[in-house]
Amino acid sequence: MSEEVLTDLAPLAENRSIALNCAGDALVIGSDTLLYRLLFNLAENAIRYSRSGSTVNVSISDSDSHVLLRVKDEGPGIPKQYRESIFQPFFRLDKSRSRAYGGAGLGLALVWEIAALHGGTVEVETSSENGTTMLVSLPKRSAALTEQ
C-alpha cells in the first residue's frame, strides 16, 4: 500500500521538486481504504510543508505486535505547544500557513481518528525548524476487527 500512496503522490512531489523515499514493509490487518487515507494524508502533508528540493521519507518497521510508520519531512516544524492541537479538526498554526499551503485542516484529524479506530496512536515524534517526523503505531491486527 505504501508504494501505491507514493505513486499517487508522485505528481505533487515532482511539481514541488521533492524526492519521495520509502523503506520497509509490514502487514496491518484493518481497513485498506482507511489505512491508505492515513498514509496518504501524512505523506501529502509532508510534501506540502517541505521545502522545494528536499526529501520526504516514509519508513515502516515491524515489531512482534505493532507496525511503526514514520513520515519525515523537511518543513518548518511544529512548535512544541501545538503538537497535540494539530490533530483537532480545522486547527491551523496560523492563517498565513493555511493560505500558503492550502488544505482544509482535516488531514491530521482524520489520521488521528483512523489510527484510533485501528487501536493505534499518532504523535509528533520529533520536530524542529529542519522538519518533522510523525509516528503512527498500529497493532498488527486492528482493534475494530477483533471486536467483531
Regions found by a protein language model. Name each.
Residues 27-30:
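Conserved micro-motifs of the catalytic ATP-binding
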Residues 53-65:
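Short beta-strand/loop element within the Bergerat-fold HATPase_c
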Residues 73:
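Acidic ATP/Mg2+-coordinating residue in the GHKL
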Residues 119-120:
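Conserved glycine-rich
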Residues 78-92:
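Short conserved segment of the HATPase_c
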Residues 46-47:
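Short helix-loop "hinge" at the ATP-lid/N-box region of the Bergerat-fold HATPase_c
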Residues 11-25:
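Short conserved segments within the C-terminal catalytic ATPase subdomain
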